[in-house]
C-alpha cells in the first residue's frame, strides 16, 4: 500500500468515525452530572434537587448506576470506531448499539413531545408532578434530553457506519 493510499484511507476512516466520537462525548457528558448528583452536588439537576432521593437505593441506581451505564455507553461508542473494537463481534455490537440508539432517541423525542403537549394545553401534569414541572430547574431537562437525542442519533450513525463498512474493509480497521 502506498503512502497516498494510507493517507486517503486514514482520512476516510476519520470521516466515518466522527459520529462515534460525538456519541462517546455525549455519553460522558451525560455520565458526569450523575456522579456529582450522587455526591450531593445539585448543579444542573433537572428539578428540585432537595426533594430528590438521597441515600437510598433509588439514588444509587439513578445516579451511580446510570453514570456507570453512560460510561459503558461511551466505551461501546468508541468500540464502534476504534481499532480495539474490531475484537468484538461486529453484528452483535451493531445490533445492540442500534437497539440502544432507537430507544434513546425515542425516549428523548418523547420528552420533547410531552413538553409541547404540556405547553399547548393538550395534557395536564398529574398533581404529583405539577410542582416538579413548574420548578425553574426543570428547564435543564431540555438540555439533558437534547443530549440524550444527540447521543442516540450519533450512536445509531456510528453503528450503521460500522455495520455497512464490513469486517474486511480497511478504512475503519486502521
Question: What feature does the model see in each segment?
Answer:
Residues 95-96, 130-151:
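Individual transmembrane alpha-helices with interfacial aromatic-anchor signatures
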Residues 66-76, 143-158:
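Hydrophobic cores of alpha-helical transmembrane segments in multi-pass inner/ER membrane proteins
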Residues 81-86, 153-174:
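Cytosolic juxtamembrane helix at the C-terminal end of the final transmembrane segment
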Amino acid at each position: 500500500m502506498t503512502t497516498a493510499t494510507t493517507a486517503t484511507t486514514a482520512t476516510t476512516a476519520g470521516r466515518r468515525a466522527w459520529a462515534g466520537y460525538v456519541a462517546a462525548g455525549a455519553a460522558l457528558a451525560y455520565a458526569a452530572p450523575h456522579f456529582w448528583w450522587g455526591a450531593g452536588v445539585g448543579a444542573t439537576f433537572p428539578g428540585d434537587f432537595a426533594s430528590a432521593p438521597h441515600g437510598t437505593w433509588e439514588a444509587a441506581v439513578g445516579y451511580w448506576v446510570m453514570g456507570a451505564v453512560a460510561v459503558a455507553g461511551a466505551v461501546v461508542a468508541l468500540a464502534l470506531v476504534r481499532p480495539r473494537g474490531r475484537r468484538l463481534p461486529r453484528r452483535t455490537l451493531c445490533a445492540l448499539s442500534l437497539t440502544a440508539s432507537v430507544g434513546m432517541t425515542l425516549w428523548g423525542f418523547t420528552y420533547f413531545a410531552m413538553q409541547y403537549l404540556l405547553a399547548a394545553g393538550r395534557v395536564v401534569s398529574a398533581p404529583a408532578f405539577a410542582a416538579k414541572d413548574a420548578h425553574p430547574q426543570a428547564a435543564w431537562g431540555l438540555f439533558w434530553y437534547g443530549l440524550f437525542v444527540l447521543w442516540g442519533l450519533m450512536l445509531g450513525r456510528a453503528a450503521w457506519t460500522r455495520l455497512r463498512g464490513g469486517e474486511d474493509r480497511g478504512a475503519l480497521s486502521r
